[in-house]
Amino acid sequence: MVPSQEEPAAERETNEAQPPGPAPSDDAPLPGPGPSDVSDVAAEKVEVELTRSAGSEPPVPPEGGWGWLVMLAAMWCNGSVFGIQNAYGVLFVSMLDTFKAKDDDNMAFKTAWVGSLSMGMIFFCCPIVSVFTDMFGCRRTAVVGAAVGFIGLMSSSFVSSIEPLYLTYGIIFACGCSFAYQPSLVILGHYFKKRLGLVNGIVTAGSSVFTILLPLLLGNLISSVKLFNTLRILCIFMFVLFLAGFTYRPLVPSTKEKESGGSRSSFFSRRKLSPPKKVFNFALFKETTYAVWAAGIPLALFGYFVPYVHLMNHVKERFQDVNNKEVLFMCIGITSGVGRLLFGRIADYLPGVKKVYLQVLSFFFIGLMSMMIPLCSAFGALIAVCLAMGLFDGCFISIMAPIAFELVGPQDASQAIGFLLGFMSIPMTVGPPIAGLLHDKLGTYDVAFYLAGIPPFVGGVVLCLIPWIHSKKQRKISKNAGGEKMEKMLENQSSLLSGSSGIFKKDSASII
């Protein structure tokens, strides 16, 4: 066996200098190890080295190469999933015209639940998706999710009433989108580290681009080929998403690959399920910084989506003579894409958890812009508010995944993002209906928009605690490490003193 590089040179020379001879007798045993002991020690060294190389340390992100193709695939995923969801307003009008019954006065309420259920299910399923991502990897999870989404969207084009859409569009299609979307956030952290903020900005900008273009495309398709054929055409987006999922080549082994010793198997191989205690990694919440982050983000989102849902109706009531009300959402989509690229790049220059300050800044401005909506007496002022709101919306979204990687690391980022998105589904579902209820009671949206600006401020204040908690933890670790180092130095010094004292006594005795 080739000797280890860490083995002292003097020891090697001593072993080489000993000539072979007869086996020692029992009366004079050699102090050194025998041949069997040497082989055991060598085997232990090899085992330790193999254990270290078996995946205990995550691989270094390549910062490019195949990762650029992964980035484009993730960009298509974000664009197709949230572009379709954000353009539901166009489908909403077509569904009303297609399924409307003369004796049904609640048709708008029923139709609205289709889109609301779909958006909520995407985020609600994310904690479950994170488990599948850890168990089977990003590639398998994303591909299967896109296939399920394709089936749900295609089956939605064959219904004859609004109720089956709750299952086909609101649950099956949304769950498939969730399984395809969440791995697209996780896989980027495996391929990028230094450029992760910029890459996430580019990927999340895909939803802005699709949000700008899809409403125009859907409007033309519905007017020419009607609703059902439009849904079938949208299935093309899901099929491309299915193909894009195959680009998520894994760098970090999944849980199943670790349990099987890292051996590769077929794509749809049968695997033994993990125990429940290993499925959901609740130990993440023992990390105080992540627990605060997972509480602060949903708290800020109680008012986050109120302008996106009720802005059109507010403009209709406040500015009756304005025809192009859709330009407000186009402004939000354009500046949101700019914000994702801009702040994603800025995040690359902020070390560690200081990236959280960008989210704090974005929530403060989003809350302020929400409160300014009722104060706008001119449509031009409202356009300016929407431009600013979209810019900081892009800031908040683009750095979500980089912060998760900073707080828990790449190995646990999947479930960290999944838990967060699951928590986000609650305020996203509850906030807009509360604003609608206030409008029904008061006859105006003014109070609703004022109140919608409060939760982003509160959530931003909570997020400010994260850098403080992190720095306090680092100081404690440094202090403990310094104490251990001092104790070790004192032990070494005392051992040297005791050794020198023994030598002095031995020499004195021999002289006497």
From Swiss-Prot:
Alphabetical list of PROSITE patterns matching this protein: MFS (PS50850)
Topology, Extracellular side: 85-111, 163-168, 223-232, 313-326, 384, 438-448
Catalytic reaction list: L-tryptophan(in) = L-tryptophan(out); L-tyrosine(in) = L-tyrosine(out); L-phenylalanine(in) = L-phenylalanine(out); 3,3',5-triiodo-L-thyronine(out) = 3,3',5-triiodo-L-thyronine(in)
Residues with PTM Phosphoserine: S260, S495, S498, S500, S501
Tissue: Highly expressed in small intestine, particularly in jejunum and ileum, scarcely in colon and substantially in kidney, liver and skeletal muscle. In the brain expression is low and appears to be restricted to a subset of neurons, microglia cells, and oligodendrocytes.
Regions of this protein lying in the Cytoplasmic compartment: 1-63, 133-141, 190-201, 254-291, 348-362, 406-416, 470-512
Keywords, ordered alphabetically: Cell membrane, Membrane, Phosphoprotein, Transmembrane, Transmembrane helix, Transport
Spans traversing the lipid bilayer: 64-84, 112-132, 142-162, 169-189, 202-222, 233-253, 292-312, 327-347, 363-383, 385-405, 417-437, 449-469
Domain of life of the native organism: Eukaryota
Molecular functions per Gene Ontology: aromatic amino acid transmembrane transporter activity; L-phenylalanine transmembrane transporter activity; L-tryptophan transmembrane transporter activity; L-tyrosine transmembrane transporter activity; thyroid hormone transmembrane transporter activity
Protein's membrane topology: Multi-pass membrane protein
Location relative to the cell: Cell membrane; Basolateral cell membrane
GO cellular component, one term: intracellular membrane-bounded organelle
Null allele phenotype: Deficient mice grow and reproduce normally, show no gross phenotype and no obvious neurological defect. Deficient mice, however, display increased plasma, muscle and kidney aromatic amino acids (AAA) concentration under both normal and high protein diet, although this concentration remains normal in the liver, but it does not alter thyroid hormones homeostasis.
Matching Pfam families: MFS_1
Modification(s) after translation: Not N-glycosylated.
Region (Disordered): 1-44
GO biological process terms, semicolon-separated: aromatic amino acid transport; thyroid hormone generation; thyroid hormone transport; thyroid-stimulating hormone secretion
Biological role stated in the UniProt entry: Sodium- and proton-independent thyroid hormones and aromatic acids transporter. Mediates both uptake and efflux of 3,5,3'-triiodothyronine (T3) and 3,5,3',5'-tetraiodothyronine (T4) with high affinity, suggesting a role in the homeostasis of thyroid hormone levels. Plays an important role in homeostasis of aromatic amino acids.
Family membership noted in the UniProt record: Belongs to the major facilitator superfamily. Monocarboxylate porter (TC 2.A.1.13) family.
Name listed for the protein in its UniProt record: Monocarboxylate transporter 10
Species whose genome carries this gene: Mus musculus (Mouse)
